[in-house]
Amino acid sequence: MKHFEANFDGLVGPTHNYAGLSFGNVASLNNAAATSSPKDAAKQGLKKAKALADLGLVQGMLAPQERPDLHTLRRIGFTGTDAAILNKAAKEAPALLRACCSASSMWTANAATVSPSADTHDGKLHFTPANLVDKLHRSIEPITTGNILQATFNDSRYFKHHQHLPEHTSFGDEGAANHTRLCEQYGHAGVELFVYGQETTNPSAPRPQKFPARQTLEASQAVARLHQLDDDCTVYIQQNPDVIDQGVFHNDVIAVGNQNVLFYHEQAFLNTQAKLTEIKRKFGESAIHFVEVPTSKVAIQDAVKSYLFNTQVVTLPSGEMAIIAPTNCQENPAVFAYLNELVTLDTPIKQVLYFDVKQSMQNGGGPACLRLRVAMNQDEVAAVNQHTLMNDAQFTRLNLWVDKHYRDRLLVEDLADPQLLLESRTALDELTQIMKLGSVYQFQR
């Protein structure tokens, strides 16, 4: 049976804007109040997704969230018509309105943690939506995320969906952005790496001092239990608190893995050598490549600015691996020089392909943020909602949909415009028909 690693990219929503909501994310803060282009953002994402499909990879799309989120605004006391609620929120609590208008669900690396059937006791593919409790604008996502995942992976013979973890900082969970999987082949049992920022039940344990550690050890352990993973196929690694304080808010900003390659910065983890030894022991006899990038070649600041590690490492049909990188990596001399050297080294990585995802990058999300990886066999791929998979017809359909519904420019002050709410709901209602999702949004119920 054939096995694949599919990428499910987040479709950028109609309210994509730069509100600077993500403390700890340098790009998000630096671009606060800039003018965004929802249309360009969506098209950049679709273009990248289509390019990966054209490379022969299984590529899907996940629908965006309903924004502005009137349901949340009503929960926190705003009343009246939709237009009245938007007007009141803009005047009385503009920060809360901005949080309820974020298009952050585009970064599907934070949508959920996924464990493939080859790793789980029951032989099913498991999904746990991330609770994202550290950031208000993301903490309102998990229920709809669960709805969208269940509408996408909708065959209970193959897919097991869990509720997100309890909404408390002890279980702060940021999903696949702090999780990677190493394996010889996608269909073989692998080693799942859970990277965390702090251990909340141990006050004396290391933790960052400037920026929050969004992922807890307790959350990672809970997800592993839910997914029925054996201890001999899981490794828990603490991210270096110093790099969190330098803007590395998720592990996928400082490390990425694919099959038998772990690509990481030398400052990424605590107790690196001991953890690499544990990974190697649990990985077994097969060859594994630890590709460590030294600070002398790429400083943390350059890694964060370029998103060198927020790249996708993918296996092409030829068996070679390629890095899917943002064009920002070409524009950083140190990073570009390193990548040109990397493809000449004795590793499976032999190509670097560059994509313009600047609308996402300016909000702090690179190619890896935009995708949720799902390793599947051919029967599981066949069981996926086929209307969520990328192909020529769907690419054309979704681009026409974006052209019809999305604005060319959006400012933060536009978020209170009742017309934007109407445009967004009209677009999403049509999208659920294109992707055959059913009624996944509050306004449809």
Swiss-Prot record:
Reactions accelerated catalytically: N(2)-succinyl-L-arginine + 2 H2O + 2 H(+) = N(2)-succinyl-L-ornithine + 2 NH4(+) + CO2
Residues of the active site: 174, 250, 369 (nucleophile)
EC identifiers of the protein: 3.5.3.23
Annotated NCBIfam families: arg_catab_astB, PRK13281.1
Pathway: Amino-acid degradation; L-arginine degradation via AST pathway; L-glutamate and succinate from L-arginine: step 2/5
Native species: Shewanella halifaxensis (strain HAW-EB4)
Keywords from the named record: Arginine metabolism, Hydrolase
Gene Ontology molecular function, alphabetical: N-succinylarginine dihydrolase activity
Disulphide-bridged cysteine pairs: none
Similarity remark: Belongs to the succinylarginine dihydrolase family.
Name the record gives this protein: N-succinylarginine dihydrolase
Domain of life: Bacteria
Quaternary state and interactors: Homodimer.
Keyword Hydrolase in record: yes
Gene: astB
PANTHER family: N-SUCCINYLARGININE DIHYDROLASE
Function, as annotated: Catalyzes the hydrolysis of N(2)-succinylarginine into N(2)-succinylornithine, ammonia and CO(2).
Pfam family, one: AstB
Keyword flag Hydrolase: yes
One annotated GO biological process: arginine catabolic process to succinate
Residues noted as binding substrate in the record, renumbered to the chain: 19-28, 110, 137-138, 214, 252, 363
Record-linked InterPro entries: AstB_sf, SuccinylArg_d-Hdrlase_AstB
